């Protein structure tokens, strides 16, 4: 099952194939998630775990006068995402950064919107990562999180057994961790396939962080 390890961190030829597959395979999930969030035309957006860059391209379309940053810790993903969004990068509307969600290389209050599609399964410390997302969002900024596996059926457990370092979180786990990071006004949506979408807000007057 070595090929499937590329879902966690694409590397080599297998990784190049995987990010291409992800750009197509995650299209329906991103469409499901993006319908739940309003994005201003001039928004500054951050796509975490940007993979092959397809969702960066969608965010650019949703904010035609804004700027989109993609971040991934895979060099293969960064290269593919830069190629996918070359025109926007040339126009100064896009940047793809090699980095880690555990220590985001951005200043406080930098983005209106942050997104994470099919990626948090592989974040080693979700509490720390969510705190980083909270930090870089502007007041009233939104965090959109979308997963195909929500722990509601055996599908997620099967994939977690095949892919080293993968963990599937329940909706309650995610609610608790997001609130602990300071997020509020959480809105959760699920579809008949079991896909999960959560939109969380960084209020202008943040709520007290809740203990784990």
Predicted regions and their residues:
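Class I SAM-dependent methyltransferase SAM/SAH-binding core
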Residues: 46-103
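Conserved alpha-helix/loop element of class I SAM-dependent methyltransferases that forms part
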Residues: 24-43, 58
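Short glycine-dipeptide loop
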Residues: 42, 137-142
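A short acidic, Gly/Pro-enriched loop at the edge of an enzyme's catalytic core
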Residues: 102-113
């Amino acid at each position: 099952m070595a090929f499937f390890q590329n879902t966690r961190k694409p590397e080599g030829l297998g990784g190049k194939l995987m990010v291409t597959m992800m750009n197509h395979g995650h299209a329906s999930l991103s469409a499901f998630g993006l319908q739940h969030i309003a994005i201003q035309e001039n928004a500054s957006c951050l796509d975490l775990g940007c993979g092959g860059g397809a969702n960066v391209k969608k965010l650019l379309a949703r904010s035609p006068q804004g700027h989109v940053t993609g971040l991934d810790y895979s060099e293969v993903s960064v290269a593919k995402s830069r190629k996918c969004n070359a025109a926007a990068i040339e126009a100064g509307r896009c940047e793809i950064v090699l980095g880690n969600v555990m220590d985001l290389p951005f200043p406080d209050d930098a983005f209106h919107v942050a997104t994470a599609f099919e990626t948090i399964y592989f974040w080693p410390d979700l509490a720390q990562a969510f705190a980083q997302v909270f930090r870089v969002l502007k007041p009233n900024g939104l965090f959109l999180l979308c997963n195909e596996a929500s722990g509601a059926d055996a599908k997620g457990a099967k994939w977690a057994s095949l892919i080293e370092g993968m963990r599937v979180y329940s909706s309650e786990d995610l609610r608790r961790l997001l609130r602990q990071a300071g997020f509020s006004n959480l809105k959760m949506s699920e579809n008949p396939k079991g896909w999960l979408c959560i939109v969380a807000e960084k209020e202008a007057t943040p709520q007290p962080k809740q203990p784990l």
